[in-house]
Regions:
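N-terminal beta1-alpha1-beta2 submodule of the flavodoxin-like/Rossmannoid cofactor-binding fold
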Residues: 1-77, 83-95, 128-133, 145-157
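Short beta-strand->loop
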Residues: 7, 78, 107-111
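Acidic catalytic loop of the alpha/beta-hydrolase fold
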Residues: 82-83, 113
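A glycine-biased structural micro-motif
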Residues: 100-103
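Short, glycine-/small-residue-rich phosphate/pyrophosphate-handling segment
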Residues: 105-141
Length: 157
């Protein structure tokens, strides 16, 4: 199975999980391709990033692999900011193509945990609206150990 692991990471936590997913897929003999989403003009202030997430702004992003036709599955990841996914992920969900009928998994990384369920639900709803079949969702606390993260991933991949 060929999987696109699409994520946005500001501090590195979501990137760490994205790379762990690639490793777990590889250990199962599957092909996982990392796709790191980046806004064209990224706000450097975390507070301003959270404000943009709260206001549901959708920044322009680099045109990184928007067409998913060559993939069987998409794994979509975001940090939780102000009870929402990162704005760049919202843009990606609007602009990606060939998602209909694909298997999908959502994951979030978080600090306090406030808003993680709401964020996963919103990501799942958007993927479903676009025609994907969401088969799993999972969350990772920012200080969660790698072994615990790996165990969660082994159960859903």
């Amino acid at each position: 199975m060929r999987t696109a692991v699409v994520y946005y990471s500001y501090s590195g936590n979501t990137h760490r999980v994205g790379q762990l997913i690639i490793g777990v897929l590889k250990s199962k003999g599957e092909d996982g391709i990392p796709v790191r989403i980046r806004p064209l003009k990224e706000e450097v202030s975390f507070i301003k990033q959270c404000r943009d997430a709260f206001m549901r702004k959708k920044p322009k992003i680099y045109r990184t692999m928007l067409d998913l036709k060559d993939y069987d599955r998409i794994i979509l990841g975001s940090p939780v900011w102000a009870f929402n996914a990162a704005p760049a992920i919202s843009t990606y969900l609007e602009e990606c193509r060939s998602i209909e009928g694909k298997e999908a998994i959502c994951f979030v990384t978080y600090g306090s945990g406030a808003g993680k369920d709401k964020t996963l639900k919103a990501m799942k709803e958007k993927l479903t609206e676009r025609g994907a079949k969401v088969v799993a969702e999972v969350s990772f606390q920012q200080n969660e150990g790698l072994e615990s993260c790996r165990e969660k991933l082994e159960k859903i991949l």
